[in-house]
Amino acid sequence: MGQCGITSSKTVLVFLNLIFWGAAGILCYVGAYVFITYDDYDHFFEDVYTLIPAVVIIAVGALLFIIGLIGCCATIRESRCGLATFVIILLLVFVTEVVVVVLGYVYRAKVENEVDRSIQKVYKTYNGTNPDAASRAIDYVQRQLHCCGIHNYSDWENTDWFKETKNQSVPLSCCRETASSCNGSLANPSDLYAEGCEALVVKKLQEIMMHVIWAALAFAAIQLLGMLCACIVLCRRSRDPAYELLITGGAYA
């Protein structure tokens, strides 16, 4: 019966180590996605410390790949030292992921205030030229999120760009995709996106932060199961004389 429990734990442990390799790739992808998205929205969110959870989760992903390799070798060879190392590293990674979750919630709460502070400045510097980074960022966000202005398209009337052009129109990036004849004129508001960009940028950034949080929580749960299985194998190996005899007399002695 004890041997059956050992075999089951080892089988689950090997399977979990294979999952760790997959998890490593997923975590690195999530972290990279945060970096790429931040690059698209960095004008609206200047606090680079928000990237800390992404940096940590990429590091955890790389470490999980190594952990999976150590775990597989230690489980197959039934190495007490290897399994103990495996458990300790998993515990450290688990603690790190808890930190990622906490940081994720902290920075998620800061998103709204940070965007509100930055977006006003970005819209004021808009000049409508492609080489200008702020102008490109605004046009990109308005096209991607289907929005116009900070709260709505009327916000453009308060910008220097609107006053200087004197043509009573907003940027073409405010035009709905279905309005083929749209020229940005305020005389045809039905051709323009009605929703403002601030709320949508906040929502987008908070969703990304939640992806990091859920990824960390999901893989932390898997790591707990991995630590449990490794501890079962270690404990049975130490307490069961018959199991110890089987190991020392086998191929991996």
Swiss-Prot record:
Record topological domains on the Cytoplasmic side: 1-11, 72-85, 234-253
Subcellular location: Membrane
Parts of the chain on the Extracellular side: 33-50, 107-212
Domain of life: Eukaryota
Keywords of the record: Glycoprotein, Membrane, Transmembrane, Transmembrane helix
Membrane-topology annotation of the record: Multi-pass membrane protein
GO cellular component annotations of the record: plasma membrane
Subunit structure: Interacts with claudin-11/CLDN11 and integrins.
PANTHER family hit by this protein: TETRASPANIN, TETRASPANIN-3
Name of the protein: Tetraspanin-3
Encoding gene, per UniProt annotation: TSPAN3
